[in-house]
Amino acid sequence: MAKYVSLTEANEELKVLMDENQTSRPVAVHTSTVNPLGKQLLPKTFGQSSVNIDQQVVIGMPQRPAASNIPVVGSPNPPSTHFASQNQHSYSSPPWAGQHNRKGEKNGMGLCRLSMKVWETVQRKGTTSCQEVVGELVAKFRAASNHASPNESAYDVKNIKRRTYDALNVLMAMNIISREKKKIKWIGLTTNSAQNCQNLRVERQKRLERIKQKQSELQQLILQQIAFKNLVLRNQYVEEQVSQRPLPNSVIHVPFIIISSSKKTVINCSISDDKSEYLFKFNSSFEIHDDTEVLMWMGMTFGLESGSCSAEDLKMARNLVPKALEPYVTEMAQGTFGGVFTTAGSRSNGTWLSASDLTNIAIGMLATSSGGSQYSGSRVETPAVEEEEEEDNNDDDLSENDEDD
């Protein structure tokens, strides 16, 4: 480009310094005479102006002279445009511009993209298997890498399998997919927050009910322990006072039950030959009371079941239970324990009662069975609570060894 363009005074020579990059050769310099201008349209100025109208010069670019008498009055292009158009070259962007391949991702099989492909594959199929997902992704990779060497291709295929299993394990941990043996099922993301909240409330209520049931069972067991230990102490005291053991026919062994009914009730009892089964038939309702309820009537529980326990009786009751249960005994005496008692007895018009049935009813909460049981009288009617058995979970994390199963 030209460095300088200088113009001397009017009516003198026009000197042009040519481009440094151009080769040196003779330069034609055209001189032109600029006559003093006559009337010209100039912008209106305010105040005095320092511009000399008679000495005005029109600066023009050197152009090809058309005639000797035609003055050079200007250029169709401004200087900057004129010089830029002489040296400007146009370049087009390469087809690979803007594409940056990451070093660790070949053919779009990086960890992030591969995880998305695993997501899309399982979501599209709904129910599939690990081998099916891996096979589809490996097939896509092989179709996209035809020019790869065998060793590199085998390494990439093994890497894809490993990353596919990792992605499936993460989706299972997030509960987006589920696995049953070799089958994989799509679950999806949970979007219904209101339903989840309602489910949590229902689950919370169920757990609170179970806590209440456990509290009631604990209260019954504490009362039984206090009643039996207090009964043992009382019998020992009576034997020391009379200095002899009671007669065998005057002793009632525990466990036992008491069946009560109205005096006008007609009771028919049938006994089997081996005296192992008894059939009772009542023409009116009746009640069955177990040994713990009878001991409560006798005052062996110090009134803990009703919350009316004196300070002295409370001290004795605390001495009859392990130290870890003493706070619960105090709550029972104050009436702040969470247990609830019922007083309605079991009623029926007729039932078979075997010796084993009588024993089970009498023992009650001392031996809690897994199937649950019902307790009459002051016992709480406790529904069966199924214990969740811990099953052997064979659904380990997915690995490449699953293909050999």
Curated annotation (Swiss-Prot):
GO molecular function, one term: DNA-binding transcription factor binding
Ranges for region DCB2: 254-310
Induction: In response to DNA damage.
Site (Critical for repression of E2F activity): 121, 130-131, 140
Stretches with biased composition (Polar residues): 80-93, 369-379
Expression by tissue: Predominantly expressed in testis. Low level of expression in pancreas. Highly expressed in ovarian and colon cancer cell lines.
PANTHER family reported in the protein's UniProt record: TRANSCRIPTION FACTOR DP, TRANSCRIPTION FACTOR DP FAMILY MEMBER 3
Subunit architecture: Heterodimer: with E2F family members. TFDP3/E2F heterodimers do not bind DNA and repress E2F-dependent transcriptional activity.
Protein name as catalogued: Transcription factor Dp family member 3
Top-level taxonomy: Eukaryota, Metazoa, Chordata, Craniata, Vertebrata
Gene name tied to this protein: TFDP3
